[in-house]
């Protein structure tokens, strides 16, 4: 039962002796200055956690892999996830990929939640902000992140993320972010909007208009 990410992270943190805790995950290639620049900004900005941008790359040359990479790095695909869509200025945010933390953060607010096989970083960063912490995204540092190459792999990954979102929100006592509800609301709107418009024809025009605008935006972006 302890062979999952949050347990491994906590064991590593407890065994650490330095002033900085840095998490590096797979599917990524890190620049040579990754550690030095982030550690410098961590103390220069008096931040509690800093992180880098993602440059999302396709896993192979297939059309699907390229489409997934594009969708995973565009506002139309991932909304306001700043580290995925990119920024040009050092920016305070609600989460960063992986993270470069001050060691004393874990003494102040505790370790990663071991109930969360997925999303443990989201819960931790939300807990950090709720405790008055400061999280900063650094555009000077860019990680090459390789996206999944098939829809089935993407679906499996996002299903796991979605599965643990309610538990994260329950532990926090409030939603970690508002944007997490947009996909759900959109899908429910598609499903129930069509059903409701059958009984209220006047709503049919609004329903079709929304779908048409969405289609145009999809083609544009």
Q: Where do the model's predicted regions map?
A:
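Glycine-rich, basic loop-to-helix element that forms the pyrophosphate-binding segment
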Residues: 1-16, 37
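Conserved nucleotide-sugar donor-binding
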Residues: 17-18, 98-109
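Short aromatic/hydrophobic "clamp" motif used to bind/position activated sugar donors
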Residues: 21
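The conserved acidic donor/metal-binding loop of glycosyltransferases
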Residues: 25-29
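Conserved donor NDP-sugar-binding/catalytic core segment of glycosyltransferases
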Residues: 33-66, 70, 142
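Catalytic donor/gating beta->alpha subdomain of glycosyltransferases that bind UDP-sugars
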Residues: 42, 58, 113-176
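Short, flexible, basic/aromatic active-site loop/helix in glycosyltransferases
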Residues: 52-54, 58, 68-92, 96-98, ...
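Membrane-embedded multi-pass helical conduit in multi-pass membrane proteins
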Residues: 186-221
């Amino acid at each position: 039962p302890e062979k999952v990410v949050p347990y491994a992270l906590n064991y590593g943190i407890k065994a650490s002796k330095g002033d900085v805790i840095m998490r590096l995950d797979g599917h990524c290639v890190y620049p040579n200055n990754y550690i030095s620049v982030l550690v410098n900004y961590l103390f220069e900005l008096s931040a509690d956690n800093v992180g880098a941008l993602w440059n999302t790359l396709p896993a192979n040359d297939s059309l699907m892999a390229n489409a997934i990479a594009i969708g995973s790095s565009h506002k139309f695909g991932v909304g306001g996830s700043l580290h995925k869509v990119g920024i040009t200025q050092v920016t305070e945010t609600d989460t960063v990929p992986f993270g470069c933390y001050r060691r004393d953060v874990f003494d102040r607010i505790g370790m990663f939640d071991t109930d969360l096989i997925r999303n443990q970083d989201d819960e931790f960063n939300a807990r950090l902000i709720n405790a008055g912490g400061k999280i900063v995204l650094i555009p000077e540092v860019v990680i090459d992140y390789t996206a999944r190459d098939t829809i089935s792999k993407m679906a499996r990954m996002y299903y796991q993320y979605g599965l643990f979102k309610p538990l994260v929100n329950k532990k926090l006592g409030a939603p970690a972010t508002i944007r997490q509800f947009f996909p759900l609301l959109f899908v429910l709107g598609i499903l129930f909007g069509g059903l409701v418009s059958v009984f209220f024809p006047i709503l049919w025009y609004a329903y079709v208009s929304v779908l048409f605008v969405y289609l145009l935006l999809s083609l544009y972006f």
